[in-house]
Swiss-Prot record:
This is Ribonuclease H. Monomer. Its cofactor is Mg(2+). Mg(2+) 2 binds at D13, D137.
Length: 146
């Protein structure tokens, strides 16, 4: 039962210089009394791709199903996975404007991972003093290779 799963809190962020351009992503995972950070980069990407990658890489670290509280400052990620994705599936992965969904391969991977875990999604305002959001932001920006 998914209610009996172990719990993890995750904060993610992505950053990009140029958009498109070099980018970085990061996640802070909080397990009970333990904290783990992960981060990475891409030489030619977009901010949205980095935001998605941060969430995907964090969820991929979890080898068994977890109850996940996931905090992102990306409306694109939160609304995409909680609202838009259902409509995209019904519309053959087309947007409301009948255009192909951007970053489709990332959305497909995120959808699969999110369905494996029990994820509760939260949007957090960026740059207002949330400790772990700031940590993820700092790590993501540190990964940008100019």
């Amino acid at each position: 039962m998914k209610d009996e799963l172990n719990k993890v809190v995750i904060y993610t962020d992505g950053a990009c210089s140029g958009n498109p351009g070099p980018g970085g992503w990061a996640a802070v995972l909080l397990f009970d009394d333990n904290e783990k950070t992960i981060c990475g980069n891409d030489s030619d990407t977009t901010n949205n791709r980095m935001e998605l990658t941060a969430v995907i890489e964090a969820l991929k670290l979890l080898k068994v199903a977890y109850n996940v509280d996931l905090y992102t400052d990306s409306v694109y990620v939160k609304d995409g996975i909680t609202l838009w994705i259902r409509k995209w599936k019904v519309n053959g992965w087309k947007t409301a404007n009948k255009m192909p969904v951007k970053n489709l391969e990332l959305w497909l991977e995120l959808d699969s991972l999110a369905n494996f875990h029990k994820v509760t999604w939260y949007w957090v305002r960026a740059h207002v003093g949330d400790l772990y959001n700031q940590k993820a932001d700092m790590l993501a920006r540190s990964q940008i290779v100019r």
